[in-house]
Amino acid sequence: MYRLSSCLRRRSRPAGAWVAVGVLMAGCSASVSGDTTESDASSSISATSSQTSTMPPGSGTTSPGTPSDTTATAAQAPFVPRTITVVMNGDVLLHGGLWTTAEIDAADTGRGDMDFRPLLSDLKPLVSGADLAVCHMETPLAPRGGPYASYPVFSVPPAIVPALKWTGYDACTTASNHSIDQGFDGLARTLDYFDAAGIEHAGTAATRQASREPLVMDVNGIKVGLVSATYGTNGIPLPSAQPWSVPLINIAKIERMAARATDEGADIVMVALHWGLEYMHEPTDDQVAIANQLTRSPDIDFVYGHHAHVVQPYDKVNGKWVVYGLGNMVAQQLTSVEGVDDGNSCRVTFRERPDGSFRVQKLEYIPTMITPFDGVHPTRVLNVPQDVDDPEFAQLRPQLQATDDRVGTVVTSLGADKRGVTEGQ
């Protein structure tokens, strides 16, 4: 995985318009099972390079009785499409109660003072089973040993990072309304932790140069670009010396970053937005308008979001998939609002076409649930379809079923199920 790495196979721009030659996770003109409308979106990136023949003219001809030349043979070889699966999750929002959970678990596992791995362990098969898995780090990370701070101005334990890596996350988006809760130093420190753990990141930047470079990852030979931006920073001014450190939602800038990803060989470009209104299941007019503009870009294939802390619908806009809100992946919000403990993992499978582009072959939502913390039993994030009928979780079955029902109702409220979106596991 790398930034701005070059790739021989690119999208060309005939007659001034970009044509996808290999699309990213952004859902450009890909078809979902059961949906005859195509929307491009792919998450595998080809890093193979072609070679130019240096043979003199005529040297490729064959004499009578020799086998047909290799070029003709290659041209007749059957096309074998490649596929790639990408999993995305919503907010990683570490309220103080979750630190207690990690302390309780660390006492059992012996892994330091805090161990967040048990918190996420139920998601590990789903996350690690994807070709590419992307999380969203909502808040800045504190120095090792603290001090730590919870809502409303966060500085959270860095022990979450090795837990995310262990769970199977390859990359995290970092642009959010809390990005500069601890100033530029906190922002840069957070990225340092991700770098040290080998987790790629998109969104916030520690240098001006990095702020201009989209993340382009090589996933089994397919290049996937990722662009991240946020609606704002809770009224905290951007650092005067580093105003570029947090990318705000700006249509023209996002489109330019997506185009740069394409120029650097991205087969698929995905845009992750921190947007919407908290605790609102319905996308706002602004979300709908932004989605309408971004999905018209030939360089953007799939758009998804977070921030509302509740699940929002999936929809197809201009032939491309938009996931308005994934809900919380992990949080402990002290509110009576129904649905803050609900989330969903979005899993998209892309399939290569003969022209080298990728289409969405399958789009799934997997409901997740955050269990309550009672001061004794540690919190867990559960894969709902996997656990709802498991005897181990019999006492939680009513809550699991309620989460399953709520998430399914919201995700399909704009008709995504009629276009082939299904519940996965």
Set out the residue ranges of the language-model regions:
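Juxtamembrane proline-rich low-complexity "stalk" or linker regions positioned immediately after a signal peptide
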Residues: 40-62
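Bacterial lipoprotein signal-peptidase II cleavage site
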Residues: 28-38
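Sec-dependent bacterial lipoprotein signal peptides
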Residues: 1-26
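Intrinsically disordered, low-complexity segments enriched in small/polar and acidic residues
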Residues: 37-41, 46-47, 412, 422
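Short stretches within intrinsically disordered, low-complexity N-terminal or propeptide regions
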Residues: 17-22, 32, 43, 49
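Acidic, metal/ion-coordinating pockets
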Residues: 2-8, 29, 55, 60, ...
